């Protein structure tokens, strides 16, 4: 099942994101076969303010475990994380 993971950073925590970025990217590299795409949400001024990941997991519990162990989550970066099952429709 494909999941969209929508993460919102806590306000004023850009430095937390920057300090943990390499660990986060290394963590994602361990999910090469499951990671479809990922990237940051940006503010109007171009600062990173959240993350969106599209990933393939067997179960919602697998997606939750992935999120719980993300270095950004462990560093306390996120004010919220939403995990939503998703089905690609277009383009066909």
Range-by-range predicted roles:
Residues 1-92:
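Conserved, structured core segments of small domains
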